């Protein structure tokens, strides 16, 4: 009599959450939106906030979620200190959400195609040094543009010139003020930025 015994092995699959580090300089509304979005997701989580502004409102927002906060000066950004701190968190993706300084090449080269930025216009229009926030919206209105939008792109060594990942347009009415345009852009940022980040984490 031959006895055959079959062993069934169940392999447990452990899902490793991908790590997001956010760089921000201002109020942090986009940062908070991203943090909240990934609280309900299994693909990734925000592990730290980096800022160059010691009085930025993003600091208070980060404290609500008990996240580590790294505050640094412009000079420190171009030293090895910030890169070393960033490496400590081992991020899968670095997200610039209203970060107003240009990243040094040392950071960009350490995280190729893993640093993204959101810009409040349809690049390549209204990009480059000094083109951020209300500066962009004023230029859009002054030039009587019929549409504007957001651009999410990879970061390279030049301002706003990295490969484009995603764009979304919105109509600009002749009666729109820069403040109205800013509100329209903010709505797009809140709606699309987190999901684009999720798509990037899923595809990599």
Task: State what each model feature region is.
Residues 1-9:
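Hydrophobic alpha-helical signal peptides and transmembrane signal-/tail-anchor segments
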């Amino acid at each position: 009599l031959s006895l055959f015994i079959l062993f069934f092995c169940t392999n447990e699959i452990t899902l490793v959450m991908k790590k997001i580090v956010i760089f921000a300089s201002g109020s942090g509304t986009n940062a908070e939106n991203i943090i909240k979005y990934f609280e309900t997701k299994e693909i990734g989580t925000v592990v730290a906030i980096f800022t160059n502004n010691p009085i930025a409102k993003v600091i208070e927002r980060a404290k609500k979620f008990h996240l580590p906060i790294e505050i640094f000066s412009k000079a420190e950004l171009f030293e090895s200190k910030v890169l070393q701190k960033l490496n400590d968190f081992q991020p899968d993706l670095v997200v610039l959400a209203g970060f107003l300084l240009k990243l040094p090449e040392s950071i960009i080269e350490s995280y190729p195609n893993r640093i993204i930025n959101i810009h409040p216009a349809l690049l390549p229009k209204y990009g480059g040094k000094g083109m951020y926030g209300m500066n962009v919206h004023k230029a859009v209105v002054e030039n009587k543009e019929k549409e504007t939008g957001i651009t999410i792109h990879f970061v390279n060594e030049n301002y706003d010139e990295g490969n484009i990942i995603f764009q979304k347009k919105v109509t600009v009415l002749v009666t729109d003020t820069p403040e109205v345009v800013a509100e329209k852009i903010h709505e797009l940022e809140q709606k699309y930025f987190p999901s684009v980040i999720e798509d990037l984490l899923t595809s990599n």
